[in-house]
């Protein structure tokens, strides 16, 4: 759970998230071509702990979406949010919410990081 993972990895190596978002948005374009209209992807940025992290990553997602929109001449609808899975994210949720269109709660990870235990350990 700790270290160079989640959104921090995406900030250091944006090409990873650019590739994933490009694939999501091209799949959405294909769905629209097939007249499947009810799909709105929810792109969840992992392991966010600060407002800056989600802002950087959301800006990346929006930039990639615009690139795909321009290339395919297709309007894309999507949401960007995060999972509250770190104690700091829970404490800073008000700030993080300025950039998140949805939240999910990672109760297993949140419990593990709050108590400093591994999931392999039985209490």
Predicted feature descriptions by range:
Residues 1-121:
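Conserved alpha/beta-domain cores
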């Amino acid at each position: 759970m700790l270290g160079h993972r989640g959104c921090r990895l995406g900030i250091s190596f944006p090409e990873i998230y650019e590739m994933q978002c490009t694939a999501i948005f091209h799949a959405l374009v294909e769905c629209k071509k097939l007249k499947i209209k009810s799909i709105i992807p929810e792109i969840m940025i992992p392991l966010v702990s600060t407002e800056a992290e989600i802002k950087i990553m959301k800006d990346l997602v929006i930039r990639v979406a615009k690139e795909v929109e321009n290339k395919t001449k297709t309007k894309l609808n999507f949401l960007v949010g995060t999972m509250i899975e770190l104690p700091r994210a829970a404490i800073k949720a008000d700030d993080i919410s300025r950039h998140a269109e949805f939240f999910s709660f990672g109760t297993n990870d949140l419990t593990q990081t709050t108590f400093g235990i591994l999931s392999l350990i039985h209490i």
